[in-house]
């Protein structure tokens, strides 16, 4: 039986692997390079999960999609041969663009998907 890994969550599970696959296919990267990207992404997700939250139900889409996008950015820089400092810069630039999204709840847990809340 295969396992499905939601990285970082089920609601954002297509962001990171989709971005990684697109880059890997475009640049014809080998499997070990892609694995290194996934390892870098797992470290990024681990830091966020231990210091903040990754659940959209708690932190809104900034937490869920933001973490996934940061994981993707870091993974791609790693796959392209970037330094750890460059990976960090990619994460920071990605997160800066996702902070303060207006769709997130001001004081609490969301009760429905963004489309329903903003619809």
Regions flagged by a language model, labelled:
Residues 17-29, 76-81:
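Alpha-helical support elements that line or immediately flank enzyme active sites
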Residues 18-22, 36, 40-43, 71, ...:
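Alpha-helical scaffold segments in soluble metabolic enzymes
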Residues 6, 30-39, 83-95:
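Short alpha-helical "patches" and their helix-cap loops
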Residues 32-53, 98-105:
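Acidic-glycine-rich active-site phosphate/pyrophosphate-binding loop
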Residues 1-5, 48-58, 106-110:
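Glycine/charged-rich beta-loop-alpha catalytic/anionic-binding loops adjacent to active sites
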Residues 56-69, 73-79, 84-119:
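A structural signal for small-residue-enriched, beta-sheet-centric alpha/beta enzyme cores
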Residues 3-19, 63-68:
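Conserved phosphate/anionic-ligand binding catalytic regions in large, soluble enzymes, centered on
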Residues 16, 40, 44-47, 51, ...:
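Amphipathic, alpha-helical segments enriched in basic
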């Amino acid at each position: 039986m295969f396992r499905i890994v939601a990285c970082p969550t089920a609601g954002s599970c297509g962001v990171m692997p989709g971005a990684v696959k697109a880059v890997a296919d475009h640049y014809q990267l080998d499997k070990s390079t892609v694995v290194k990207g996934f390892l870098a992404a797992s470290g990024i997700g681990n830091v966020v999960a231990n210091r903040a939250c990754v659940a959209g139900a708690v932190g809104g889409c900034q937490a869920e999609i933001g973490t996934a996008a940061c994981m993707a950015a870091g993974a791609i820089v790693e796959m392209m041969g970037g330094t750890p400092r460059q990976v960090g810069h990619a994460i920071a630039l990605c997160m800066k663009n996702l902070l303060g999204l207006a769709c997130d709840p001001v004081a609490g847990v969301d009760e429905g998907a963004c489309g329903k809340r903003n619809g």
